[in-house]
Curated annotation (Swiss-Prot):
The active site is at E305 (proton acceptor). NCBIfam families: cobT_DBIPRT, PRK00105.1. The lineage of its organism: Bacteria, Pseudomonadati, Pseudomonadota, Alphaproteobacteria, Hyphomicrobiales. Pathway: Nucleoside biosynthesis; alpha-ribazole biosynthesis; alpha-ribazole from 5,6-dimethylbenzimidazole: step 1/2. GO terms for biological process: cobalamin biosynthetic process. It comes from the Bacteria. Catalyzes the synthesis of alpha-ribazole-5'-phosphate from nicotinate mononucleotide (NAMN) and 5,6-dimethylbenzimidazole (DMB). This is Nicotinate-nucleotide--dimethylbenzimidazole phosphoribosyltransferase. Gene3D superfamilies: 1.10.1610.10, 3.40.50.10210. It catalyses: 5,6-dimethylbenzimidazole + nicotinate beta-D-ribonucleotide = alpha-ribazole 5'-phosphate + nicotinate + H(+). PANTHER family: NICOTINATE-NUCLEOTIDE--DIMETHYLBENZIMIDAZOLE PHOSPHORIBOSYLTRANSFERASE. Its EC number is 2.4.2.21. HAMAP family: CobT (MF_00230).
Length: 344
């Protein structure tokens, strides 16, 4: 994407002109679904998922190159003691991902998913959102553009996740700015905050939204002021996937906050996305409901790292396999449902 005018201008234009679903592919998928050897609707959400795949990929439902993209960033707000872990853990976990030692690695192996890790200037934490913007408009736009590169090399199902010590504080601030309520409602334990650490976390969320209160009517301004590099990169990846007709699975609380900024800018911006799971982070269910989405899984997980989306990818793959691999009534020689008799 070439930047012209103000850094956000190209993204604003893109958000105004998002492509819609492929109605021809959707109709074809519905016609085939009606002929498969099962009672109508008996596969429940698997059938809905298959239709969603068709509509947003523009082809018969298939998942052959699924990818998990994890974006890692560090946050200046951690100087306020909002988390029990040091920011060095972000880099250490990136190295753990690369070595294959994290939970996401095992889930990717189990579900046969590709995995890419994006290190977003970990040595340079974002600004402290309680007293300054996290990013300049230029840096935020550049990070969104970088996130768009997640789909380079090809994928037909993108799972977005993150790693970043302090980023549930960021997500809570974004949700408070978007939806109102109280900092307490949106702020959860994250990596295990409790007691005084939780009190500092809530105070930081309150202070951040109060400091930036005159600039929160524009979702992209919320992103740069209260967000982080992984937030911007996830938003960019979701946008790029929309343009390239790649369905998206969104992970947990932090990834959902990034996605919510896009929906605030364009109410249809997440139509090509599903929420992989509802996390154990207390504010996530409320955030998902604000998006009008129903998560695929509810396993009490709150790890992040794309794990919930990666688990849900197995369900999406199964939905595509059922749609493409099942026999039709005619091909299998199975009788269809008897039509009700008409009284004469």
């Amino acid at each position: 994407m070439s930047m012209s005018g103000l850094p956000f201008d190209d993204f604003r234009a893109l958000l105004r002109e998002l492509p819609g679903p492929d109605t021809h592919a959707l109709v074809a998928a519905k016609e085939r679904n009606a002929q498969l050897t099962k009672p109508a609707g008996s596969l429940g959400r698997l059938e809905e998922i298959a239709m969603w795949l068709a509509a947003w990929s523009g082809r018969s439902p298939a998942v052959t190159r699924p990818l998990v993209a994890i974006f890692a960033g560090n946050h200046g707000v951690t100087r306020h003691g909002v988390t029990p872990y040091p920011t060095s853990v972000t880099q250490q976990m990136v190295e753990n991902f690369a070595a294959g030692g994290a939970a996401i690695n095992q889930i990717c192996v189990a579900n046969d998913l590709g995995l890419k890790i994006f290190d977003l200037a970990l040595d340079y934490p974002t600004g402290d959102i309680t007293c300054e913007p996290a990013l300049s408009e230029r840096d935020c736009a550049a990070t969104m553009a970088f996130g768009m590169e997640a789909i380079a090399g090809g994928t037909d199902l993108l799972c977005v996740g993150e790693m970043g010590i302090g980023n549930t504080t960021i997500a809570a601030a974004i949700n408070l700015a978007l939806y109102g309520g109280t900092a307490e409602e949106w702020t959860g334990p994250g990596t295990g905050s409790e007691g005084e650490v939780m009190a500092r976390k809530i105070a930081a969320v309150k202070a951040a939204v109060e400091f930036h209160k005159d600039h929160l009517s524009d979702p992209l301004e919320i992103m740069r002021r209260l967000g982080g590099r992984e937030i911007a990169a996830i938003a960019g990846a979701i946008l790029a996937a929309r343009v390239q007709r790649i369905p998206v699975l969104i992970d947990g609380y932090v990834a959902t906050a990034a996605a919510a900024l896009l929906k605030a800018a364009n109410s249809s911006a997440l139509d090509h996305c599903l929420i992989g799971h509802v996390s154990g982070e207390p504010g996530h269910l409320a955030a998902v409901e604000k998006l009008g989405k129903t998560p695929l899984l509810a396993l009490g997980m709150r790890l992040g790292e794309g794990t919930g989306a990666a688990l849900a990818a197995g369900i999406v793959k199964a939905a595509a396999a059922c749609h493409s691999g099942m026999a039709t009534f005619e091909a299998a020689g199975v009788d269809t449902r008897i039509s009700p008799r008409t009284e004469h």
